């Protein structure tokens, strides 16, 4: 079985850019998890409100909610 070894020096290095240098601090917390529930309750509330919003839009689209004074074709 033929195998080929590649030295580390021959691997292409990622090019450093100005944007990458500016965004690097934003990724410094990668892999760290806050103890406890964190912001999970806020996300649950946001998801519930978004679901209500979508259901209202769907009901308006299906004309199952009567809108007084708004003419539709």
Swiss-Prot record:
Molecular functions per Gene Ontology: phosphate ion binding
Pfam families listed in its UniProt record: PsbH
UniProt key word Disulfide bond: no
Gene Ontology annotations of biological process type: photosynthesis; protein stabilization
Modified residues annotated as Phosphothreonine in this record: 3, 5
Gene3D superfamilies on file: Photosystem II reaction center protein H
Annotated localization: Plastid, Chloroplast thylakoid membrane
Region (Disordered): 1-23
Transmembrane segments: 41-61
Domain of life from the UniProt record: Eukaryota
Lipid bilayer topology: Single-pass membrane protein
Sorted UniProt keywords: Chloroplast, Membrane, Phosphoprotein, Photosynthesis, Photosystem II, Plastid, Thylakoid, Transmembrane, Transmembrane helix
Transmembrane as UniProt keyword: yes
Annotated Gene Ontology cellular component terms: chloroplast thylakoid membrane; photosystem II
PTM characteristics: Phosphorylation is a light-dependent reaction catalyzed by a membrane-bound kinase; phosphorylation occurs on Thr residue(s) in the N-terminus of the protein.
Family: Belongs to the PsbH family.
Summary of subunit composition and partner proteins: PSII is composed of 1 copy each of membrane proteins PsbA, PsbB, PsbC, PsbD, PsbE, PsbF, PsbH, PsbI, PsbJ, PsbK, PsbL, PsbM, PsbT, PsbX, PsbY, PsbZ, Psb30/Ycf12, at least 3 peripheral proteins of the oxygen-evolving complex and a large number of cofactors. It forms dimeric complexes.
Functional summary from the UniProt entry: One of the components of the core complex of photosystem II (PSII), required for its stability and/or assembly. PSII is a light-driven water:plastoquinone oxidoreductase that uses light energy to abstract electrons from H(2)O, generating O(2) and a proton gradient subsequently used for ATP formation. It consists of a core antenna complex that captures photons, and an electron transfer chain that converts photonic excitation into a charge separation.
Protein name stated in the entry: Photosystem II reaction center protein H
Native species: Triticum aestivum (Wheat)
Taxonomy of the source species: Eukaryota, Viridiplantae, Streptophyta, Embryophyta, Tracheophyta
């Amino acid at each position: 079985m033929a195998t080929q070894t590649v030295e580390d020096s021959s691997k292409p290095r990622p090019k450093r850019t100005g944007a990458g240098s500016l965004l690097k601090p934003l990724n410094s917390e990668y892999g760290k998890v806050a103890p406890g529930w964190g912001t999970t309750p806020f996300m649950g509330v946001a998801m519930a409100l978004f679901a209500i919003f979508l259901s209202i839009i769907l009901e308006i689209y299906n004309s199952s909610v009567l809108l007084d004074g708004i003419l539709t074709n």
